[in-house]
Amino acid sequence: MSSVLFANQRETNLASTVALVEAALAELGHSAPAIRTKDMRALHAWQIPKGSSLTKVTLSHRTDFTYLRVCATVMTLDRAVDRAALFAHLLDLNASLCGVAFATAGDQVLLIAERSTLDLDLSEVLELIRRVTTYADEHDDVLVSRFGGRLGA
């Protein structure tokens, strides 16, 4: 009986989180159906263009609960980039940022915020999306100018 209840709780949480994300996207001026995308690792995904970066909002299954992740591709590295200097700089930036962190995936520099969807509300979804898109837009040109590479993916 408890596994059925747990499954229903997950399904209810997922449905309400999709509604929250789509309400947040609408409030930010985006049509959720128009920016919905496929991501094989996510239950649901949307892509938001802002400036030269592309931000992906995803809902992913984790052992304990579903998680909301907001991830912007800030820049793509090439062979000329001094990775050690860039990575040291990104770590320094991480210490000054609120609620987000720079990360890498292959040759891409990402800016990521993530949290459980448990007790999530609209203001938190809006804040995560705004924070990631704003920080990505503020830092992408500066990072590419200083270290090389190219903007976005």
Predicted regions and their residues:
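A short, solvent-exposed beta-edge/loop patch
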Residues: 101-133
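Long, contiguous binding/interaction regions
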Residues: 134-138
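Short, highly charged C-terminal tails/helix-capping segments
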Residues: 143-153
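Short histidine-centered catalytic/ligand-binding loop motif
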Residues: 6-9, 71-76, 121, 125
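Short, internal acidic amphipathic alpha-helical interface segments
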Residues: 69-108, 112
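Charge-rich, low-complexity N-terminal segments
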Residues: 1-54, 104
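Hydrophobic-cavity lipid-handling domains and compact docking modules
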Residues: 40-76
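Ordered, soluble secondary-structure elements with a strong preference for glycine-centered loop motifs
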Residues: 11, 15, 80-81, 119-126
